[in-house]
């Protein structure tokens, strides 16, 4: 993730605010024979509440392939308040030929966002994921 890098958290916040933000999920695949989509395209979530989203993934190729998901949130100023408790994007994923899987991401929006003049009025955010072949991903890191 670029400027909109999200945070990794070990625990949920202690408070849930009676304010909602609409979170849109954008899914992409690069250099893999995979279909990848969110089961829910948009979620209206309360700030501070833990949410769970499922993604459907399918390998339509004829061999086992490995993917790594990169992620980014926009607007980028929101990234520090988008906290993941668990995500398929933390690890390399493998899918056999024809295999379908459900990947899960658990997240919350940090209540501190309402104290930041750059984020307190944000009502819509987009979480984007792109799966790359792990071979491609490793080469790009050299």
Where are these regions (language model features)?
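Terminal connector regions
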Residues: 64-74, 78-81, 85-86, 111-142
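Intrinsically disordered, low-complexity Pro/Gly/Ser/Thr-rich segments with frequent PxxP/GP/PP motifs
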Residues: 43-44, 49, 60, 86-113
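Mid-length scaffold segments of soluble, non-membrane domains
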Residues: 33-84
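Generic structural hydrophobic/aromatic packing signal, biased to beta-strands
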Residues: 21-25, 69, 90, 129
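Membrane engagement elements in two modes
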Residues: 1-35, 142
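Buried hydrophobic-core signal for structured, non-transmembrane domains
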Residues: 54-57, 105, 127-129
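Short, well-ordered turn and helix-capping elements at secondary-structure junctions
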Residues: 29, 38-40, 113
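A general secondary-structure signal for short beta-strands and their flanking turns/coil
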Residues: 18-20, 50, 64-66, 100-102, ...
